[in-house]
Amino acid sequence: ILPFNKDDMNKVPLDEYGKDKLASEMYLKEEYRKNGFPATIVMPGQISGPGWTIINPWGNTSMRVIQDIADGKEIALPNFGMEIIHHVHGYDVAQVFMNAITHRNVSLGESFDAEAENSITLYGYAKHLYEFFGHEPKIKFLGWNEWCKYEGNKEECEHTYYHIIRSGTFSIEKEKRLLEYKPKYTNLETIDLAIQSYIDRGLISVKR
């Protein structure tokens, strides 16, 4: 059921990282219920913006796909490119933390998502970057195993897998209602700022 319910504890994590996160959340909520420990859970999307390593249209952190798009080359996306990722500016993540502190009376014992208003598919993301760099999109699609061979890096392929296997969307209505959360940046603004930061720092080269 979408959007994901942040208060549903039946999350069935897929890896040790996810299991550890869920165990931490359950422990903190139990400590709040039993002992009044002042716990609030904040769960960010993919934190991005200037200076951050941004999740790319492959769902990992490889520079290759961004450079290929910047050069106007063809890229391949896994499956049909319809998996969803969630960029959020670091400023807005900090805003959720700060608002949880200033709205302590309603935030204790609760879980909140730190997200932008919208999310984006891998395909939509890739198209946006082609437009950002002034090129026509050149995108093809490969089945998962074939795409992993194309990507060529086992660790990066695994990184992609865990980013896209539980594709979905989030609602920030609870954050707006209880914390008066008002995201300053859209996900596309956040992506653009991060990519421009890559260019400014010489991590991505652009032909003039």
Question: What annotation goes with each model-predicted range?
Answer:
Residues H86-V93, T186:
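A conserved structural motif in NAD(P)-dependent oxidoreductases
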Residues V65-V88:
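A conserved pocket-lining segment of Rossmann-fold NAD(P)-dependent short-chain dehydrogenase/reductase
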Residues N35, G49-R64, A100-F112, H135:
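Glycine/proline-rich active-site loop of Rossmann-fold NAD(P)-dependent oxidoreductases
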Residues Y185-R208:
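Amphipathic terminal alpha-helices
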Residues G90, C148-K182:
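Conserved C-terminal active-site "lid" loop/helix of NAD(P)H-dependent oxidoreductases
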Residues V93, F97, A114, Y125, ...:
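Non-catalytic, hydrophobic alpha-helical segments
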Residues N99-H159, R201, S205-R208:
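Mid/C-terminal beta-alpha module of Rossmann-like enzyme folds, strongest
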Residues M9-I41:
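Active-site Tyr-X1-5-Lys
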